From Swiss-Prot:
Binding site for K(+): E44
GO MF terms, alphabetically ordered: ATP binding; magnesium ion binding; methionine adenosyltransferase activity
Keyword terms: ATP-binding, Cytoplasm, Magnesium, Metal-binding, Nucleotide-binding, One-carbon metabolism, Potassium, Transferase
Protein name per its UniProtKB record: S-adenosylmethionine synthase
GN (gene name): metK
Keyword flag Ribosomal protein: no
InterPro entries listed in its UniProt record: ADOMET_SYNTHASE_CS, S-AdoMet_synt_C, S-AdoMet_synt_central, S-AdoMet_synt_N, S-AdoMet_synthetase, S-AdoMet_synthetase_sfam
Self-association and partners: Homotetramer; dimer of dimers.
Catalytic activity: L-methionine + ATP + H2O = S-adenosyl-L-methionine + phosphate + diphosphate
Region (Flexible loop): 100-110
Manner of cofactor binding, per the entry note: Binds 2 divalent ions per subunit. Binds 1 potassium ion per subunit.
Cofactor(s) listed in the protein's UniProt record: Mg(2+); K(+)
NCBIfam families: metK (TIGR01034)
Length: 393
């Protein structure tokens, strides 16, 4: 990639229909884990106007009121009015869960007498990434796209911008100079609003646009990056119908939003609703943990990790490190350090990151990575010092 370029990432709010589905799926996973952390869960959710469908495969000894969990999640997000097209009190909730396939279970449960050699729950490839563009070691475009929709929700919920509704999308286009963030070229923010905020079908009131720019955007983005920034606020002019009424929502449809905003490849596996025996989730978290510690150790300015697995086999097929020429030692040597300092077998990951806990609903909006939440063990940099010492730095 050229040293001077534009790069764009997007995020969506907790009220976006796909994110509503993700949060319900992870709320159900958490509810199950509170009673039975050894459960096997693959909880999928569909949301539409006045309707939630819960389906998937769950094997558990827990007794969970799935319908109530879905309603509570919808209420927390803010869909508490029939005018929004879905209301936690009155929406229909259909439940159609089955148990995990015995064919899968035998590969995961009985791969070895050594529990650390328990096999992966599926084949697949996963990526982790970190870079020095932000203190959180995340790419700047996705990091700030998340913060914009997070602030939209905050101002909606605390009443400072009471005309906002739950659905919103953000997009940040960053200008890079010499390969580093230089300024923000364009910010797009589309936020659902009450009908009386629309002047016409094609034009928003100036006061609404000003409020969004001054109260949501400018407090979030670094002032020095807002040089000649273009602001596109509700470009269609009207955003009243949104959430599950505006679009059908599905679990696992925002995988780029959930990860790095397109700054690195994605293996294709979604996260929400999956217990950590599913390497789609746990190995992606571990790969972020590895990449972040490598950058925090000063071994590279940016780092991409790829891991891959076969179903029923514990050890990854490959662990590949790519630093795009920013590494202070060869990538092959960094990869050898990864093998030495991180246990990337599924059970090893679960132990290393303490993943058999009800911590997942919080991950399901505003990004799984780059957030300093105490539950997000994959964001720790506790291996950085050991990596640096082992590299001889």
């Amino acid at each position: 990639m050229a040293n001077d370029f534009l790069f764009t990432s997007e995020s969506v709010s907790e009220g976006h229909p796909d994110k509503v589905a993700d949060q319900i799926s992870d709320a159900i996973l958490d509810a199950i884990f509170r009673e039975d952390p050894r459960s096997r869960v693959a909880a999928e959710t569909l949301t539409n106007t006045g309707l939630v469908v819960l389906a998937g495969e769950i094997t558990t000894n827990a007794h969970v009121d799935y319908i109530q969990v879905a309603r509570d999640t919808i209420k927390r997000i803010g869909y508490d009015n029939t005018d929004y097209g879905i209301d936690y009190k009155g929406c229909a909730v259909l439940v159609a869960y089955d148990k995990q396939s015995n064919d899968i279970a035998q590969g995961v449960d009985h791969a070895s007498d050594d529990h650390l050699n328990t096999g992966a729950g599926d084949q697949g490839l996963m990526f982790g990434y970190a870079c020095d563009e932000t203190p959180e070691l995340m790419p700047a475009p996705i990091y700030y796209a998340h913060r914009l929709v997070e602030r939209q929700a905050q101002l909606r919920k605390d009443g400072r911008l009471p005309f906002l509704r739950p659905d919103a999308k953000s997009q940040v286009t960053m200008r890079y100079v010499d390969g580093k963030p230089h300024s923000i070229d364009t910010v797009v923010l589309s936020t659902q609003h009450h009908p009386d905020q629309s002047e016409t079908a094609t034009r928003m009131k100036a006061s609404f646009i000003e409020a969004v720019i001054e109260e949501i955007i400018k407090p979030v983005l670094p002032k020095e990056w807002l040089q000649e920034t273009k602001y596109l606020i509700n470009p269609t002019g009207r955003f009243v119908i949104g959430g599950p009424q505006g679009d059908c929502g599905l679990t696992g449809r925002k995988i780029i939003v959930d990860t790095y905003g397109g700054a690195c490849p994605h293996g294709g596996g979604a996260f929400s609703g999956k217990d950590p025996t599913k390497v789609d989730r746990s190995a992606a978290y571990a790969a972020r943990y590895v990449a972040k510690n490598i950058v925090a150790a000063g071994l590279a300015r940016q780092c991409q990790i790829q891991v891959s697995y076969a179903i029923g086999v514990a050890r990854p097929i490959n662990v590949t490190v790519y630093t795009e020429g920013t590494g202070v030692i060869p990538d092959e040597k960094i990869a050898a350090l990864v093998q030495e300092h991180f246990d990337l077998r599924p059970k090893g990951i679960i132990q290393m990151l303490d993943l058999l806990r009800p911590i997942y609903e919080k991950t399901a909006a505003y990004g799984h990575f780059g957030r300093e939440e105490p539950e997000f063990t994959w964001e720790k940099t506790d291996k950085a010092a050991a990596l640096r010492a082992a590299a001889g730095l």
